[in-house]
Amino acid sequence: MTCGSGFGGRAFSCISACGPRPGRCCITAAPYRGISCYRGLTGGFGSHSVCGGFRAGSCGRSFGYRSGGVCGPSPPCITTVSVNESLLTPLNLEIDPNAQCVKQEEKEQIKSLNSRFAAFIDKVRFLEQQNKLLETKLQFYQNRECCQSNLEPLFEGYIETLRREAECVEADSGRLASELNHVQEVLEGYKKKYEEEVSLRATAENEFVALKKDVDCAYLRKSDLEANVEALIQEIDFLRRLYEEEILILQSHISDTSVVVKLDNSRDLNMDCIIAEIKAQYDDIVTRSRAEAESWYRSKCEEMKATVIRHGETLRRTKEEINELNRMIQRLTAEVENAKCQNSKLEAAVAQSEQQGEAALSDARCKLAELEGALQKAKQDMACLIREYQEVMNSKLGLDIEIATYRRLLEGEEQRLCEGIGAVNVCVSSSRGGVVCGDLCVSGSRPVTGSVCSAPCNGNVAVSTGLCAPCGQLNTTCGGGSCGVGSCGISSLGVGSCGSSCRKC
């Protein structure tokens, strides 16, 4: 009889076949950090009597293992065999009708676990990039710290420059103060000179008043003399008229009498000559007095005019000097005020620069402390990331070892099933969950039984079978709840328990 199955599209013949529907043996797990492994085996085999089934057990959380249909490679040469008709009757294989749904769910779970594994790989890469970024930041902050160490000498140099400028300003202020004192002394001298000139002017004015009084007296005398001259002239005129009247009267009295009298001419009184002489004398006196008064008055006026001009010129020069000194005093006062303001500004700038320098230094120290704290935090974060990365890598290494272990286990079990060996005891353990042990039985009519092992394991994964490859003895220790763990402490595969010489790790 020829029977077709879905094992890789190959056909084989058998005398009688009873077993589960064609499928694959799948052992899955939900390990630490979502890393999944999947192994499927397909193939066909031939035998006289095959009874297959599965029984699944779980221990702990997030672990589940299933197996259905264990297949081994077909013999190299298939011969024609006779078919027992009685074996064609339908058999009650006690197969769960929901096995296909469970397998589909397992496929989806494996896909999700693979996606999580890929996400964890991406996360590892991202953490490596973050590690590189933190190293770059650390290098940058170290270089920046080296660059910021030159700020303090710059601030000290700038403060020293400002101090030198302040000293120069103080020296200039001292020099300006000495110049101001000198100018004040000169001003005091000019004030004294001005006071002397004022006193001289007062004296000259007093002299002018006295001379004016003298001139007034001379003018009054001149007026008196002129009045006297006029009075004398009037008197002379009166006497002349009187003399003429008397002569006329005498002539009228003697007109009728002719008397010849001879007189001595030397005894005659010549009034005209006398009057002329007196008049000449008075005219000479008046002329001399007038000339003397006019000359004295002109000389005094010229002298007073010269004195007034001289004192006015001196007063004008003194006023100009006083104005010049006032302008110089104002200019020097403004310069002194400007120097004081500049000195105060420079002192304020020095104080502000010192405050800014102190603030900048404190800010730089705070930033340095913050950068050191950030660097320390970055180092701690990097150490945590490295630890997590090592844990992830350890988990990945354990899962890789699990995958390799499952592959070797399935290959060995497949070979043993093909050779027709009886019960197979499978024990799977993980450090993040419990242990599942299943007994796979391939016999004529024996049902499949399984046992659950919940004993803890030292490594990440431990898988053992109840059959020893060299000696063919059964390992019953897994059914009791213990698993073989290799000395490496990570994962081990124990096949059989007949002795230490047949255990494989």
Curated annotation (Swiss-Prot):
* Ranges where the record places region Coil 2: 270-413
Classification from the root reads: Eukaryota, Metazoa, Chordata, Craniata, Vertebrata
Give the UniProt record's GO annotations in the biological process aspect: intermediate filament organization; keratinization
Subunit description: Heterotetramer of two type I and two type II keratins.
The species this protein was found in: Homo sapiens (Human)
User: Which residues lie within the region annotated Tail?
Assistant: 414-505
Segments carrying the region annotation (Linker 12) are 253-269
Give additional notes from the record: There are two types of hair/microfibrillar keratin, I (acidic) and II (neutral to basic).
Q: What name appears for this protein in its UniProt entry?
A: Keratin, type II cuticular Hb1
Give the gene that encodes this protein.
KRT81
Where exactly is the Glycyl lysine isopeptide (Lys-Gly) (interchain with G-Cter in SUMO1) cross-link placed along the chain?
Answer: K212
Q: Which GO terms describe its cellular component?
A: cytosol; extracellular space; keratin filament
Give GO MF terms, alphabetically. structural constituent of skin epidermis
